[in-house]
């Protein structure tokens, strides 16, 4: 991008050359001197000038360095610096680096002079990396405006890629770099990111999964979210089980049986955990819950923090454990996910030639949760088995996981195609749009979340409704505000308007847009 002043136009470009270093290239239309300085240093930061580098040290041991070529005149001023480039020859190259320790900084600073003096190989590698991503993603039969959506989705995912640091023992993808509270790794977010990146960066996809399993509990539980500071991790709840799907996507694109073998025991342990600590009445149908007995954490475990279906829920202690609590309702989406996990675990066990030894209730889920009174999938109350008739996005999951019967899906079509309920301006909201509790800005009580919209669209495709699935896909692509233009991809959107709502630059929306793009017309 460029900065235009009254007498000068400055253009700069930033390219990552490694996980820790970005190369800043600066050009201007005159030969006037350039003066650089820092601003807004944190109060705990100590700034020093050492040889050709400005080093900003944090008490934690982390450092940021800004390294110049030898012809730049560096000076320290108070707790700041100046860098003067006299009669510059363009481009001016500057290396900006982040290191987690003094040792790491010392080892890497010695590599920067060669980068600054001859950046061409690193820039070529960067260009080839991006070309590789896009070659694997882009189709030859899509309109340019839809290709732009796919490129924007890839760019969003890669811009949210973070290297290992502190308590994050593997690299991975954060939900959004633009929002301070989204700078960790979440479980079901990570499964989506890995499924979305498996096609164009499978190694990143693998490490994203490994990062969450670094904190697998002794009983098999995968905790909700992890941070660079492990004291901030949330182990009160898990998240919906989609990880076997992510592993299978990686296997589909790589054929990497070694990765399947690495993950299988951990996947099996996590799958068993659900039936051990989230099946209150031991009937094979699980509930969302928490380790601490709070409804807040149990709702977080569903991933749908304030969903209308949980408005009347209460918590029940599960017999035999101090850290096992369930909501008093069995959830259709959870058990549909578990049915898919079971199917894929069986696939993996066959691939690895080892017996599958875990509960299998997958054949019972669809009939158990199908409410014939309204021809829709619903959660059920534990106390009497009655259905919680608040039709919502959880009903899309049996279609996506392919456990519904064709007759069930056919009978759902009138409600799914009702423009007052689910066939809205942007299709497939989190709750039927005519529900009295529907809130257009209510997070999981009305807005569009693109994972759920994807589950519905792919679900229709799974049962032969391809033309309808394509129509809904184009509604998403054409109607979401700014999607085909320059606006960032957001966390969720307005059901009746397509307006951008919560966090921008959102990874899981990007993953599912890539999936819609890939599925269209197939």
Where is each model-derived feature located?
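Single conserved hydrophobic/aromatic residue that forms the stacking wall/gate
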Residues: 1-5, 10-12
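Extended, well-ordered alpha-helical scaffold segments
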Residues: 108-129, 145-152, 201-214, 257-275, ...
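TPR repeat positional signature
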Residues: 244-247, 335, 342, 453
């Amino acid at each position: 991008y460029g900065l235009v002043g009254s007498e000068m136009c400055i253009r700069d470009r930033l390219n990552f050359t490694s996980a820790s270093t970005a190369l800043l290239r600066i050009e201007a239309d005159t030969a006037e001197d350039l003066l650089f300085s820092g601003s807004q240093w944190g109060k705990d930061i100590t700034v020093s000038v050492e040889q050709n580098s400005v080093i900003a040290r944090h008490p934690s041991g982390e450092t940021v360095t800004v390294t110049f070529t030898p012809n730049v005149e560096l000076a320290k001023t108070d707790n700041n610096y100046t860098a003067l480039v006299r009669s510059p020859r363009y481009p001016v190259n500057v290396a900006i680096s982040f290191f987690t320790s003094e040792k790491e900084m010392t080892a890497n600073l010695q590599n920067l002079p060669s980068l600054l003096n001859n950046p061409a190989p690193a820039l070529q590698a960067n260009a080839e990396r991006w070309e590789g991503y896009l070659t694997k993603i882009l189709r030859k039969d899509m309109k340019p405006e839809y290709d732009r959506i796919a490129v924007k989705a890839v760019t969003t995912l890669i811009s949210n890629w973070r290297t290992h640091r502190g308590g994050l023992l593997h690299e991975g993808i954060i939900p959004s770099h633009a929002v301070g509270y989204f700078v960790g790794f979440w479980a079901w977010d990570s499964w989506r990111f890995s499924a979305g990146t498996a096609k164009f960066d499978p190694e990143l996809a693998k490490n994203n999964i490994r990062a969450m399993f670094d904190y697998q509990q002794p009983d098999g539980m995968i905790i909700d979210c992890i941070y660079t500071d492990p004291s901030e991790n949330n182990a009160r709840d898990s998240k919906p089980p989609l990880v076997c799907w992510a592993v299978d996507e990686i296997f589909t694109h790589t054929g990497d049986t070694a990765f399947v073998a690495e993950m299988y025991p951990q996947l099996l342990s996590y799958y068993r955990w659900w039936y051990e600590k989230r099946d209150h009445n031991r009937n094979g149908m699980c509930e969302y819950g928490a380790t601490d007995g709070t409804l807040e954490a149990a709702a977080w475990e569903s991933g749908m923090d304030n969903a209308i279906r949980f408005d009347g829920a209460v918590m029940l202690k599960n017999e035999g454990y101090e850290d096992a609590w369930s909501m008093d309702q069995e959830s259709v989406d959870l058990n549909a996910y578990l049915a898919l996990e079971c199917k894929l675990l069986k696939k993996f066990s066959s691939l690895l030639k080892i017996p599958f030894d875990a509960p299998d209730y997958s054949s019972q889920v669809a009939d158990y949760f199908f409410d014939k009174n309204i021809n829709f999938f619903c959660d059920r109350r534990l106390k009497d088995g009655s259905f919680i008739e608040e039709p919502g996005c959880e009903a899309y999951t049996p279609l996506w996981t392919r456990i519904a019967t064709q007759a069930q899906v056919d009978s759902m079509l009138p409600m799914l195609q009702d423009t007052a309920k689910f066939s809205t301006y942007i299709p497939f909201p989190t709750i039927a749009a005519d529900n009295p509790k529907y809130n257009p800005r209510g997070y999981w009580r009305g807005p569009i979340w693109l994972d759920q919209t994807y589950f519905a669209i792919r679900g229709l495709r799974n049962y032969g409704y391809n033309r309808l699935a394509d129509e809904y896909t184009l509604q998403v692509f054409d109607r979401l505000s700014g999607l085909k233009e320059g606006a960032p991809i957001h966390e969720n959107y307005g059901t009746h308007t397509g307006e951008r709502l919560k966090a921008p630059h959102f990874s899981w929306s990007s993953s599912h847009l890539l999936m819609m793009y890939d599925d269209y017309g197939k």
